[in-house]
Amino acid sequence: MNTVTDQPHSISVNQLRAFIERIERLEEEKKTISDDIKEVYAELKGSGFDSKAVRSIIRLRKKEDHERMEEEAIIQLYKNALGMS
């Protein structure tokens, strides 16, 4: 097994290489998924939907109900304070 012993702790070169290669594969998959998501947003926009509004909905759906309700209450409070409601 190849090891690097110049460091205070020995590092397995093979293990390090495996970690790096896994990260590289995952980064490539992440790029592919990101490209797929962009395509879906383009289709969505082409169908007449507002992509900005859909992004907001997706962001809100990731939150727990109580977090979402708290955020909406704070936004409403700020809008009221600024005379926007």
From Swiss-Prot:
Q: What stretch or stretches form a coiled coil here?
A: none
User: Record's Pfam families?
Assistant: GapR_DNA-bd
Query: What InterPro entries does this protein's entry cite?
Result: GapR-like, GapR-like_DNA-bd
Q: Name one GO molecular function term.
A: DNA binding
Q: Which domain of life is it from?
A: Bacteria
Q: Which family does it belong to?
A: Belongs to the UPF0335 family.
**Protein name per its UniProtKB record:** UPF0335 protein BQ12070
Species name for this entry?
A: Bartonella quintana (strain Toulouse)
Upper lineage: Bacteria, Pseudomonadati, Pseudomonadota, Alphaproteobacteria, Hyphomicrobiales
